[in-house]
């Protein structure tokens, strides 16, 4: 009888355990990130600390080039502008003698040509700005957006074997999705001309125009009687340029609030980092460091004037440094 009782007890325990649902492993919100302290800081901030922030104040700002999309050797804006310059020369060969058109031709042949990349400014003339401003001068704004979208989604980028439109970092796209799932409002804020972001972001990563902040090229309105108004691109920009503190001016003017999270990849994003660091809510600032020469490129996190003490700034302000080589398990959206 004792043996029967023991057997019944064992069977009861086995039955109860078999009926009890097994714990389900939580879904990893950042599967393309390696298991590091950086990933733990991100999941702790977004999954835990963000609960202390009212939903209407959960605002995150991201740079674009070099932060969520590749910018080396050519970023989206300059790739499209170069093609525009080449097509102008085909229509008017006399333009070929001008320096900015010569630069565009050189980069179309060799995107890493240092005779161009290291000499944008000559005798006080910024030929990078010249290429960008002249490439689609007097073009209808919406027509340009369609042109740029077609070019970026059909033209293969150097080195990667993918079209430009696929050169988004998979880990960063996961981070954007994770933030959205936790009720964050996200804005892309970079020095890139706003028109370039409008051409690729809505269809590629699902960001509508209302969430894009960039340098605004001047537009001249035209009001035809038989169709909707059009806006013609001019060779100038509306100030301030969306870089450094210009980003913060545009963020505050547009949003009217201080964000709680900022992510960038150059010292030009330090302004955004300083801004979020003043928030009364839990906040986070992170720099993506390009140190992976095998899967992408290695380059310093500044443009123009060297900033050798950039890591000191990160350390002093408790900003995060995310090294691509260590943090990204996978780099590209559609390719390992």
Q: Residue ranges of each PLM-predicted region?
A:
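A generic hydrophobic-helix recognition signal that picks specific residues
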Residues: 11, 56-60, 183
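Bacterial N-terminal signal peptides that target proteins for export
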Residues: 1-7
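A metal-dependent, Asp-based hydrolase signature
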Residues: 74, 79-165, 170
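C-terminal cap/substrate-recognition subdomain and adjoining C-terminal extension
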Residues: 22-29, 33, 41-43, 47, ...
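Short, solvent-exposed loop/turn and secondary-structure capping segments
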Residues: 71-74, 79-82, 199-200, 275
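Bacterial N-terminal signal peptides
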Residues: 7-16
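Non-catalytic pre-domain segments flanking phosphatase-related domains
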Residues: 18-64, 72, 79, 86, ...
